[in-house]
Swiss-Prot record:
InterPro entries: Cyclin-like_sf (IPR036915), Cyclin_N (IPR006671). This is Cyclin-Y-like protein 1B. Belongs to the cyclin family. Cyclin Y subfamily. It comes from Homo sapiens. Residues 111-209 form the Cyclin N-terminal domain. GO terms for biological process: regulation of canonical Wnt signaling pathway. Transmembrane segments: none annotated. Pfam families: Cyclin_N (PF00134). One of its GO terms (cellular component) is plasma membrane. The lineage of its organism: Eukaryota, Metazoa, Chordata, Craniata, Vertebrata.
Amino acid sequence: MPKNFASDCPGESTLFLRKYQMSVQEKRSSSHLYYIPPWHLDRKYGSCSTILLDNSTASQPDLRHTLESVALAIYYNIKHRYANRSLAIFEEPVHPLPQEKLPGKSFKHDPKRNCIFRHFCTLFQVIKLTAPCAIVALVYIKRLLTSANIDLCPTNWKKIVLGTMLLASKVWRNHGLWSVDDSQNSKDTAVENMSKMEKCFLELLEFNIHVSASVYAKYYFDLCALANDHDLYFLFSFLHKDKAQKLEAMSRLCEYKDLHQDAAALKRVISMNFIGIGCSNAILS
């Protein structure tokens, strides 16, 4: 049985949010003041009945906004790592992603936020991934770091991100594990190396690839909080009639499904209550 990770507890804070809070604490201690982001000072709040909505939900997140948020999460995981612990199979200098080895100086410094974001954009464009895959991949990264007792470093973050993204894509689409057709990276990554990395990932995760809805929601809202603190906002628009009708239709569909699921469950319970009860013959006196 795969073990339960502490990060899977809905009440437990996510790793990247704790790392970000470390940066906030550093800014506070260095300035000896309570750190308030500058964009919070001029933010305006409305008290009218106008409803503004964005095009992102937990089930269908906005792709660009999600990638920017996940890039921030990876950035803080690397910046506030405990050490440079890693495994050889994840080390890019040992098993490089491109066919040609990168110069060693590429791994001496922590990657910048825009560098991580550009890498994500390229990765999602080539492999055709969806926004939820990035959120699920963050869950896998936390499990991997905890189980293998390693850190996200300049030398291994690209391979770990690639592996978790591919695994999340397979699980999200409910397909078999990595294949050459889905990875679409034969010119950049050796198939043999990907197979070894696949096996290593699953063993380190102890085949615990299930992500509950509560854990997914926790990561989604923590990413929203992280993005909000970095002035990464969604593009809001007024709630118009067509959008309201669409939301109402989606809500009714969910209620309809829940109602029928409850009715089916009630039928099963009632039928189970009568299992084993035979027809008894009436005794007339």
